[in-house]
Amino acid sequence: MIKQLTILFLSSLLILSLYSSAVAQTQTPYPDTIERQIKELLKETRTYFDSSKPVKVVKMVKAPKKHYYTVLFTYYAYSNDYLGSATFKKEKDRYTFINGMGSTVQKLNNDTMYLDKVPYSVVYGFNEGNRIKMLRLFTLDKKSSYTAPIKKGTYFIHFKKLPLNTNLEKMKPFYIDCYGKDNKLIPWGECAE
C-alpha cells in the first residue's frame, strides 16, 4: 500500500511540475516594466499619444551587443496604429531604456544607433503573411548600402553592424526595395503602406 501511495504521489508531483512548466512558457517573454517604461516615454514625448489605449509589446529581440534588447511595440494615436521600437539594456534582471522611441504608421521603419560606441543600422517592420523575404537599403553613402534578409514572423528586426568611422547621417536610407517570394520586387505601396 505504501508503495502505491508513493507512486501516486510521485506521479502527481511529476504532472504538477509539467503543468507549471507549461504555464511558465506561455507567459510573456518580457517583463511588464518594459511596457510601463514605453508607455511613460510615449506620454512624455508624443503629445498625440492616446494613453487610454493599450501599448502592446509585439516582439523582443536580443541586439548584437551583449545585454541589449530591442523591443517592437504598437500604440494608438490620432486615428492611426503606430509601430515603434525602443532599445533596453538588461542589468541584474532590470531593463533600462537607452535608445529609440522611433515609430511609424507605415509597415517599415529604419534607424541608426550606437550600442557601446559601435554604430548599427536597424530596420524593422510588420510582415503580414511573411510576404517580405529581403530588403535592399540604398544609402547616401553608396558603399554602405546593404541587403537585409528577413526572417519569418509577423514582425521583424534586422541589425547591420557598421564600421566605427561611419557617418550615421549618410546612413539614413533614402530608398528601400522590398523583395518577396522568388525574389520579385514588391511595389512600395504594398510593402510599406
Stretches with model-predicted labels:
Residues 127-133:
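Short proline/glycine-enriched turn/loop motifs at strand-loop junctions of beta-rich domains
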Residues 134-193:
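Ser/Thr-rich low-complexity repeats and stalk/linker segments
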Residues 99-124:
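Extracellular ectodomain segments of secreted/surface proteins
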Residues 88-102, 189:
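Short beta-strand edge/turn micro-motifs at domain boundaries
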